[in-house]
């Protein structure tokens, strides 16, 4: 059983947590359909046990305080982003706990702007990293971090220990990559289908969606044309 833990804090982005964790939960469901035991146990860790209000206005429940957790019991530790992260960038007890956790967990990663928390802990020094496109400039302030702001995520099976993802829903793509590495591509694809993912995107794909380009056009006729083209690539477009 792999124990997957995600930090939560006031004003955290709820989808940074629920998106990736649902991927792991759905992987358990796929295994159950095959008569196999669950592969993952999921945990939320806060500064203290109890409800934590997200930026969406609803609360998630931290089952335990992170300071009480032995990182060696965790397979994967995820650090999400959100408006509340600014209060954590100089939260020395948390940053020190993350430093101590890093060599003891099998995998440590961030979702969205959670990369800034890892950067402030010094854990991204000498590593490539990405984050939400709106926070790339802030991450570039850390000179020892190789910022690759176009990437969807930086997870690689060849270097699986430390990784980051781009904004919000990119955390789902990151979690699918982790599931694929753990349980195989068929399970990851089954989860993507179950979650009605449009694409299972690789980590080196840009986080800017070409499919959203038509939405940026203010000319309705041009917008309609740009929407029509990718749906009709088999036709003569000359």
Where are these regions (language model features)?
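Extended, subdomain-level signal for the structured scaffold at the beginning of enzyme domains
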Residues: 1-108, 117-120, 149, 176, ...
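A generic structural signal for alpha->beta connector loops
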Residues: 39-41, 105, 126, 144, ...
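Glycine- and other small-residue-rich loops at beta-strand/loop junctions that grip anionic moieties
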Residues: 87, 128, 164-167
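Conserved anion/nucleotide-ligand pocket segment
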Residues: 155-194
């Amino acid at each position: 059983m792999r124990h997957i833990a995600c930090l939560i804090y006031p004003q955290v982005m709820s989808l940074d947590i629920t998106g990736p964790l649902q991927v792991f939960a759905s992987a358990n469901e796929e295994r159950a359909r095959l008569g196999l035991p669950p592969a993952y146990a999921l945990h939320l860790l806060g500064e203290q046990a109890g409800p934590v209000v997200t930026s969406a206005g609803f609360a998630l429940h931290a089952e335990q305080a992170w300071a009480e957790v032995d990182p060696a019991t965790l397979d994967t530790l995820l650090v999400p982003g959100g408006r509340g992260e600014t209060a954590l960038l100089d939260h020395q007890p948390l940053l020190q706990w993350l430093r101590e956790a890093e060599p003891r967990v099998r995998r440590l990663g961030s979702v969205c702007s959670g990369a800034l928390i890892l950067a402030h802990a010094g854990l991204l020094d000498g590593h490539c990293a990405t984050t939400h496109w709106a926070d790339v400039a802030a991450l570039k302030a850390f000179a020892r971090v190789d910022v690759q702001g176009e990437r969807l995520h930086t997870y690689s099976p060849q270097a699986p220990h430390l990784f980051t993802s781009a904004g919000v829903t990119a955390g789902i793509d990151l979690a699918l990559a982790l599931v694929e590495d753990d349980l195989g591509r068929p399970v990851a694809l089954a989860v993507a289908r179950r979650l009605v993912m449009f694409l299972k995107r690789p980590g080196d794909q840009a986080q800017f969606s070409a499919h959203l380009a038509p939405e940026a056009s203010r000319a309705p006729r041009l917008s309609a044309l740009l929407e029509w083209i990718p749906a009709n690539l088999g036709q003569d477009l000359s």
